[in-house]
Amino acid sequence: SDDGMFFTPKSLVKMIVNILEPKSGILLDPACGSGGMFIQSGDFVNEAGMNANSTMTFYGQEKTPYNAQLCLMNMAVHGLTGVIKAGESANTFYHDAHNLDGRCDYVMANPPFNVDKVKAESCESAKRLPFGMPGINKDKEVGNANYLWISYFYSYLKEGGRAGFVMASSATDSQGKDKDIREKLIRTGHVDVMVSVGNNFFYTKSLPCSLWFFDKGKNEKTKDKLLFIDARNYYTVVDRTLNEWSEWQLKNLNAIVWLYRGEKEKYIALLNEYYTVLGYEKSFAEQIDELTEKIKQCKEEAKKAIENAGRNEKKKKQEEYVDKLSALSDILNVAKEAQWLYEKFGEGEYQDIPGLCKVAYTTEEAKIDSQGSISVEEKAWSLTPGAYVGVAPIEDDGVNFEERMAEIHRELLSLQAESNYLMEAISKNMKEMGI
């Protein structure tokens, strides 16, 4: 991974595919690696009742031949076919290997971040740069290729096409020529959704990243608007060095996009999924309280049962209660995700949520209502979600600050008195011992 290459975490791939919703046509991944975007897109199309090999045509470019072979094998295992080109002739910086500029229905990618020493002259001759070249250094090289990739992804799309890709977080706010390109890009009205991702989503690197989404076929509701989602604090911990989005978290983030697009029926369908799992009798909040109490009781019951079990039965009892607690915890997690979504959007009306999501206009001219609205132009063309969504309000924990401080003060005085008593006792003992 010295030149920025690393494989894409599955939950990021799923997020990209879920938001783009591929159905039919040409899908290009110009930095295809092991083919994760193709596999997930194939699954998405097949699960919708279609045949991915019949409705989709998969094209990939991959500079590293080994990765290209891995991609083809991976696709074959999943019953997919595609055209993958490898080697220097498939280096996307210098070659449109499939001649797909302006022809793609979908572009998905996780390109290597912050690549340097890209030959500027070769890039210019390879075209696909509708907004011009990024900054060029004295050696006639592009010092950071992030905006080459961003330009390519946009250029490959046909009218009505959609793109989704992973990018280094720094690209949302980089300056110089990058900022000029970003302004031109935003003014097209085709930047659709921006998502900030937290640390530790990658297996080998802890860096934060962003997901970018373009749509050259926006509906009237989203024309001249962008949705910003700051999901840096929304994830499931897998282990000390790895985070991910669970299936329900992916659906919840996707639901925000549905409501932004005016697709309320999809949101209602998700609520019904939650009700199918949890039941309709009680609110999500009530079920959280009930399940939390059940888990507490189950732990107490498990402790007693294991203590009272014979030596030969202890392991069996432990396994039995581990399974019970795991099942209860799984349901509790579903209830928490249901409540997370419902308390924000209720029966399906989009609203800006401080610290989570914000809809902004592209330009000052596009703003049709001034109250509470903001444009990307007035934020100096930044695409950093955190600059728009703000900070989530601090939840009231029900503790009176003054009372709690007085209580802490009393505790400190008590500890101080105890400390003084102990010091006196120690000194007295040491004197008696002649020390």
Model-predicted regions and their roles:
Residues 101-431:
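A conserved structural/catalytic subdomain of Rossmann-like adenosyl-cofactor enzymes
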Residues 2-109, 114-125, 132-136, 147-148, ...:
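Conserved S-adenosyl-L-methionine
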Residues 433-435:
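ABC ATP-binding cassette signature C-motif
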